[in-house]
Regions:
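Glycine-rich phosphate-binding active-site loops on the catalytic face of alpha/beta enzymes
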Residues: 49-50, 54, 133-135, 196-202, ...
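Short beta-strand/loop segments at the ligand-binding rim of alpha/beta enzyme cores
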Residues: 19-23, 97-102, 163-173, 239-248
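Glycine/Thr-rich beta-alpha phosphate-binding loop at enzyme active sites
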Residues: 72-73, 136-150, 182-243
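Glycine-rich beta-to-alpha transition loops that act as phosphate-gripper elements at the mouths
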Residues: 29, 104-107, 172-178, 227, ...
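Short, positively charged and aromatic/hydrophobic N-terminal segments
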Residues: 320-321
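C-terminal helical cap(s) of enzyme catalytic domains, especially alpha/beta-barrels
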Residues: 60-69, 205-218, 273-296
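Catalytic cores of alpha/beta
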Residues: 34-35, 115-119, 177-188, 251-268
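N-terminal capping/small domains of soluble enzymes
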Residues: 1-101, 106-108
């Protein structure tokens, strides 16, 4: 317990200490600055920047977002200013906020990942990195880096070779036959933590025109629809590795957070919920009153779930979403 009787929800993901287990997910929080007037960034456990590439990317054609009955489709196309512009223009402002800033990194070749990380390693103000390995490897016919253990190990080892200062998280794809094998490959190659998981390829059609509702034809499905599937992935990954896991997919309520902790995640990221409500994710920490002992118990449960023994004390969760 901290002063004034406040519950201390701080934790460590590997070597990285977070104020609490709630982070803003990559792609839904921009560079953080866009939400600074709405969200007290210091109240978040941290936030993950939108993906950073070697060179600027304009992204996919509009429309880029499409709401579904149970979530959202996005096809932003990884638009970003490029790593050098991020370091020169965005990061100096972000350094003013007392929160963990995790840079999401992607590429289409091993050299892309290495170059982006080299630039970031020379910059101050970052707490760690998250590798998005769901991108196509252009040197292997467009096959995703995340699709097989050998490719995963290759890209993580390449990243690890240039990352000395900060923790390295790896964001896994849900489109794999055995998430345990993929998770183990990332762990053995040097990942400090795993983010499980990315969005699911999907589509929405306007039957009146016969055309996709997205400019890029297909997009990534996120939101409540994917939570049960991703919970299973976290559970399977937890059985395969000892590396900390950050759960991501359909987190909207206090119960969602606790569900992810119960199947073995150490923390969660909130994404689509940031688009669907005006109440910022940091509000969770204002209305949530959790027994410190029970949070620790959930964090130590790993993948063994016993719902009959769940005794977490939640205040007002029944009417709260964020």
């Amino acid at each position: 317990m901290s002063s004034a009787g406040a519950v201390d929800l701080s934790l460590k993901i590997g070597a990285l200490r977070l104020r609490n287990p709630i982070l803003a997910a990559s792609g839904t929080f921009g560079y953080g600055l866009e939400f600074a007037h709405l969200v007290e960034l210091e109240r978040l456990g941290g936030f993950v920047t939108k993906g950073l590439s070697r060179e600027p990317i304009e992204g996919a054609p509009a429309p880029r977002l499409c709401e579904t009955p149970s979530g959202m489709l996005n096809a932003v196309g990884l638009q970003n200013v490029g790593v050098r512009a991020f370091v020169a223009e965005k990061l100096p402002v972000l350094r003013k906020f007392d929160t963990a800033i995790i840079a999401n990194v992607f590429g289409y070749t091993l050299e892309d990942y290495v170059e982006v990380l080299r630039v970031l390693e020379d910059a101050d103000g970052l707490a760690g990195y998250e590798l998005n390995i769901s991108c196509p490897n252009v040197k292997r016919g467009g096959m995703q880096f995340a699709s097989d253990p050998a490719s995963v190990a290759e890209v993580v080892r390449a990243a690890r070779s240039v990352v000395a200062k900060r923790p390295l998280w790896v964001k896994l794809s849900p489109l794999v036959t055995d998430i345990g094998l993929i998770a183990r490959a990332a762990e053995e190659a040097g990942a400090d933590a795993l983010t499980v998981a990315n969005t699911y390829p999907a589509m929405a059609i306007d039957y009146r025109t016969g055309k996709s509702r997205l400019g890029n034809q297909t997009g990534g499905l996120s939101g409540p629809a994917i939570k049960p599937i991703t919970l299973r992935l976290v559970w399977e990954a937890r059985k395969a590795v000892k590396t900390p896991i950050v759960g991501l997919g359909g987190v909207e309520t206090v119960e969602d957070v606790l569900d992810y902790l119960a199947v073995g995640a150490s923390a969660v990221q909130v994404g689509t919920a940031s688009f669907l409500t005006r109440r910022p994710v940091s509000d969770l920490l204002r209305v949530l009153k959790v027994s410190f002992v029970d949070v620790i118990r959930l964090l130590s449960m790993r993948y063994e779930v016993n719902f009959s023994q769940k005794t977490v004390d939640i205040m007002m969760f029944s009417c709260y979403t964020f």
